[in-house]
């Protein structure tokens, strides 16, 4: 039925467990097999394709992804792996020959992926030396510790899947590796063939990317907890050393899975020796621990495959002068796992109002813009006005009567459009607006409304130099500087006396003050008078 949601209202004689139904819907949503249209759950195009593939839906999703994004040969390789995962493992380990079987099987083991290990086996048995007859296959299986029946089932299922893909109009090539071990290695006696010696070169990225489409909720992130010495307080000697070594090894084989699950890589997996930072697996088996089988290193391609299954959080929005825009750090979560961390994103796409505020306050008012654009001289001119105003405030000690950063911010905020959130946006808008109003962004302190009613202060009362006469009767010109900061030892007016003029002046010449500060001088002298 295309209206998949009808199952919840169907009159079953023996109704299924609703949790199982809910889990099924969640799985189909993850695989993009169902969607919502006008409030109803419906089958998607992918869902209708999955319905025609007679294998587990997760494995079917891998086939569809390979057909959609990969080459015909890649699809053929994925079909081999999917068929392998659909059946019982053909590798055998007789109780009396386990070590020998493990050594034989390790020749095929790929340390990065159990999926590629399956392809190595397929290539060696069915391709490298031609398609074997039944008798030849029996001899190979006996020597290689494979089950002849399962190998036949594997081959038959691959043939069936290839035919099914053709019916779905998928182009299927041949599962050939880019390269394989030479004949001289394959013809060596088995006891002379080293571990991993039969590994081929496959399109590992393409294979794993296709398979990840069906395993989004089967990923895991390594969580390393270094053992502490206090964990072994009750042990001594060699027992303590062995326990610490075992704990050290186990600490790296601990993974956080989807929705808070924890698991470890199955010890027999070749990947378990590498303990990669990220893995994906086709099944979880619970014994003494929750083990992951057939795990492979995650290539971190989950985000485009997951789509709406992800949740993105943002932190630390700030202005970036080098980028000319506000940026933030993005973290993308899939079933609680951070598949993307510390990605810089344009804050204007997330919060345009706040991004515009960053542009005006830190980019324009504070002048933190590293890019040049047409007619951008207003930025420096307006900054010069603020710096002059700050110097005037240091002289007059009247902060409220001079323009401030907030005044310039209010000016820009009133004239710059709301959709301008970056230097690039500003440059584009200003280039077209400049011809109509070339002085629009020129800041005029005289138009600041809050200063219109304030009493004007003459800067002539705060001169830059003091002219006096030296003890030798010659004129002396001394520079003056102003600081308005009660916590600064230089607060007030400072006379800069050159060393060569020091002997020509006397302390009595410094009982004066500049006209603008006479009121404060008189007030401080009155306060210094004795109370009685």
Region roles according to the model:
Residues 1-323, 353, 357, 383, ...:
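Second RecA-like catalytic domain
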């Amino acid at each position: 039925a295309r209206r998949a949601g009808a199952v919840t209202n169907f009159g079953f004689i023996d109704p299924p467990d609703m949790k199982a139904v809910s889990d099924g819907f969640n799985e189909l949503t993850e695989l993009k097999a169902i969607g919502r249209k006008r409030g109803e759950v419906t089958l998607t195009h992918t869902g209708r394709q999955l319905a025609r593939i007679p294998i587990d839906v997760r494995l079917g999703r891998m086939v569809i992804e390979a057909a959609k994004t990969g080459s015909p040969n890649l699809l053929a390789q994925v079909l081999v792996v999917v068929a392998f995962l659909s059946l019982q493992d053909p590798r055998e380990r007789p109780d009396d020959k386990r070590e020998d079987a493990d050594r034989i099987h390790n020749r095929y083991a790929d340390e990065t992926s159990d999926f590629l290990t399956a392809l190595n086996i397929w290539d060696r048995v069915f391709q490298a030396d031609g398609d074997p007859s039944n008798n030849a296959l029996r001899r190979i299986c006996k020597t290689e510790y494979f089950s002849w029946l399962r190998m036949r089932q594997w081959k038959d299922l691959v043939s069936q899947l290839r035919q099914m893909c053709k019916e779905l109009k998928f182009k299927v090539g041949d599962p050939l590796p880019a390269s394989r071990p030479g004949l001289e290695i394959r013809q060596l006696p088995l006891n002379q063939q080293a571990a991993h010696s039969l590994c081929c070169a496959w399109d590992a990225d393409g294979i794993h990317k296709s398979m990840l489409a069906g395993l989004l909720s089967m990923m895991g992130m390594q969580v390393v907890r270094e053992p502490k010495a206090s964990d072994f307080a009750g042990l001594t000697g060699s027992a303590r050393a062995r326990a610490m070594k075992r704990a050290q090894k186990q600490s790296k084989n601990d993974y956080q899975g989807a929705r808070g699950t924890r698991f470890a890589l199955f010890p027999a997996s070749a990947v378990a020796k590498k303990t990669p930072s990220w893995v994906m697996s086709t099944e979880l088996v619970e014994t003494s621990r929750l083990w992951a089988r057939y795990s492979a290193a995650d290539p971190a391609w989950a985000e485009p495959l997951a789509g709406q299954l992800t949740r993105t959080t943002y932190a630390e929005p700030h202005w970036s002068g080098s980028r000319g825009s506000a940026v933030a750090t993005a973290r993308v979560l899939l079933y609680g796992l951070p598949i993307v961390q510390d990605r810089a994103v344009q804050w204007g796409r997330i919060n345009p109002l706040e991004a515009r505020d960053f542009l005006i306050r830190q980019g324009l008012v504070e002048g933190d813009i590293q890019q040049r654009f047409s007619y951008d001289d207003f930025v420096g001119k307006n900054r010069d006005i603020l710096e002059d105003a700050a110097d005037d405030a240091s002289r007059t000690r009247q902060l409220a009567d001079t323009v401030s950063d907030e005044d310039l911010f209010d000016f820009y905020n009133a004239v710059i459009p709301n959709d301008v959130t970056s230097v690039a946006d500003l440059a584009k808008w200003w280039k077209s607006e400049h011809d109509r109003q070339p002085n629009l962004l020129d800041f005029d302190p005289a138009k600041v409304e809050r200063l219109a009613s304030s009493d004007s202060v003459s800067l002539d009362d705060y001169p830059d130099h003091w002219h006096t006469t030296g003890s030798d009767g010659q004129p002396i010109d001394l520079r003056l500087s102003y600081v308005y900061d009660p916590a600064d030892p230089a607060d007030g007016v400072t006379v800069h006396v050159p060393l060569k003029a020091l002997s020509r002046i006397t302390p009595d010449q410094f009982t004066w003050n500049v006209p603008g500060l006479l009121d404060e001088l008189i007030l401080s002298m009155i306060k210094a008078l004795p109370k009685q």
